[in-house]
């Protein structure tokens, strides 16, 4: 959420930012509502002060006629103040609703574009493998190896759910432990978060928990929703807190299941594990001072790249354009892995610097030594999204006999060098 004073003082820049992002937000209405709220607050302060003056004056006044006039004025105020308070509540609710529609400002070097087709490639690592045979995609590999069962998932739960079986279970656990070990070695605090969060935490991090546009599963008759990412719970753990500056930056590696409705997702690009309703993810999250956040963003990106280099998976890094940033991100990078099954790159990680956008919504501040509390910055980044990483790993490391050779770094975590054909 942007600061109201900033919106007032930079209304034209905020409007341009909304246009660049393709976001419909009424900046003028927000300014108008903010001004009306300020006017109502001042009016109420004056009315309450006058009410207190009248109470004292009535107690002192001995002239009955004058006393009657004072009592009548006090009675009028007694009716007027609740009406103004009700009006203020309505204005504040509308202001909060409209203010939430305004996205974060954008890094000046982020590319301007309408959608993901205008994201800008920064660099590549690795070469797409050249197979001396007709390669299979991960769905064909998973079924042939007996390790991914989409039919059982559809039967028990619905489409876009799946069972992992046998060596795929070991592979998921190995990927998770590999990522956690790497992050622990870089000073990240390990956390296993709840899979549910209060709606305030979702709204605070920029997600829409309810309504027709939501990608979130919510729990009926509660203020709880299934999380789409541990970013939500990791950010929410410090809601309404003030932390010491010397404790920053704080880095977390959060393990959780993630749940997404993936409404509207279809087509070959969404095949198999690419867009599913539930998956496991290790998420990086950091609280920093404003001065630290740029460097932290680059650190998270470098870790994401290191993970995919270590897994020997070709990838490219893209700078996300304004139309694809989402509400909270000031700047965002994606790592896209080469996926032979689609003959193209597919997103496997994202990392975003959300500056103070989430912190303002969640009331998270830090106190500089000897100073007043200030809003801190928050950042997030995917370490391992298991389902998509599994796609890239199976497809890039497949062999002609239908087996999959695991990269050397994963062997100790999975306990084998090769995932072989299913034994019947």
Swiss-Prot record:
A GO CC term attached to the entry: cytoplasm
An individual GO BP term: selenocysteine biosynthetic process
EC code(s) of this entry: 6.1.1.11
Residues that, per the record, bind ATP: 260-262, 276, 347-350
Keywords, in A-Z order: Aminoacyl-tRNA synthetase, ATP-binding, Cytoplasm, Ligase, Nucleotide-binding, Protein biosynthesis
GO molecular function per UniProt: ATP binding; serine-tRNA ligase activity
Catalysed reaction, written as an equation: tRNA(Ser) + L-serine + ATP = L-seryl-tRNA(Ser) + AMP + diphosphate + H(+); tRNA(Sec) + L-serine + ATP = L-seryl-tRNA(Sec) + AMP + diphosphate + H(+)
Top-level taxon: Bacteria
Homology family: Belongs to the class-II aminoacyl-tRNA synthetase family. Type-1 seryl-tRNA synthetase subfamily.
Function summary: Catalyzes the attachment of serine to tRNA(Ser). Is also able to aminoacylate tRNA(Sec) with serine, to form the misacylated tRNA L-seryl-tRNA(Sec), which will be further converted into selenocysteinyl-tRNA(Sec).
Subunit structure: Homodimer. The tRNA molecule binds across the dimer.
Major localization listed first in the record, in broad terms: cytoplasm
UniProt pathway: Aminoacyl-tRNA biosynthesis; selenocysteinyl-tRNA(Sec) biosynthesis; L-seryl-tRNA(Sec) from L-serine and tRNA(Sec): step 1/1
Subcellular location: Cytoplasm
Positions annotated to bind L-serine: 229-231, 283, 382
InterPro entries attached to this UniProt entry: aa-tRNA-synt_IIb (IPR002314), aa-tRNA-synth_II (IPR006195), aa-tRNA-synth_II/BPL/LPL (IPR045864), Ser-tRNA-ligase_type_1 (IPR002317), Ser-tRNA-synth_1_N (IPR015866), SerRS_1_N_sf (IPR042103), SerRS_core (IPR033729), tRNA-bd_arm (IPR010978)
Protein encoded by which gene: serS
Free-text comment on this protein's domains from its UniProt entry: Consists of two distinct domains, a catalytic core and a N-terminal extension that is involved in tRNA binding.
Pfam family, one: Seryl_tRNA_N
The protein's name: Serine--tRNA ligase
